[in-house]
């Protein structure tokens, strides 16, 4: 079972629909999203498989969840009581997955150490409230993608605690959960014992990161633009805001329509290279809101209209992430919705979207 690509690449519901359709056609049998808006959008576009909302949903939306057959994560007693009350009011049953906090210290019933008994009791209560159908139970690993004995020990502790909670809750309730899940990308790649009934690969679906490379997966996304104009400047010319870069020779400078409003982190100013047909072109000066400048002095065949790759097959996103001091996932999330999307299958573009028109 796969996790939906509902996280990342900007606030883009249409993209989620496209990729979710592909996952549905490819055999995935459960999707996960972060909000009710995303889940309902999938339903309105023919996605019929079960959908789990991992994030917060206001109690006022419970009737909408039930109407659209959407599963909701329950992370604490207060939310369980709210959802139960609203489900009873509208005369329906809300399918839920109980979240257990085993060491992420974020969402979920706290069950570690002295909190084990109270956590188990709280989960049992949530599973038996009227109007709720506790289909599943899950947790989230904090360091499964990190290497080292300390991290491996912590992940093992989280998993053992999770299974202990499940055993105790099932024993008290006298029935078993249909779906138990905890394996995120790191655990999918490194801890097969944690796969249980369902896995949640996030970044792995995009083919990014070391784990994807180890598994032979290929990146599914590239970000490209074109050169919009080219000018030649004498030595000593200050480029862009603040004049942090000055040409040290006669320089052929190209302008590329990609800036921080599109998702190009300003901290990468004067540090990153964009890829042209003739090789890498250094980005010069501060990145602007809507554009940036690249040095094309030694690339005379690159002209106005020539393609430039921000990241992709020829310009790995992992390098960009390293320079920015972040992870590839944050960079994909940062690509704004004003960047047009093109969907390619079998080498051909089968759909184009300018999301601002949506």
Please annotate each region the language model reported.
Residues 14-28, 41-49, 64-68, 195:
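Glycine-rich loop at the start of a catalytic domain that most often binds anionic cofactors/ligands
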Residues 2-9, 13:
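Single conserved hydrophobic/aromatic residue that forms the stacking wall/gate
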Residues 14-26, 81-92, 102-226, 233-234, ...:
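Active-site loop/helix belt of alpha/beta enzymes
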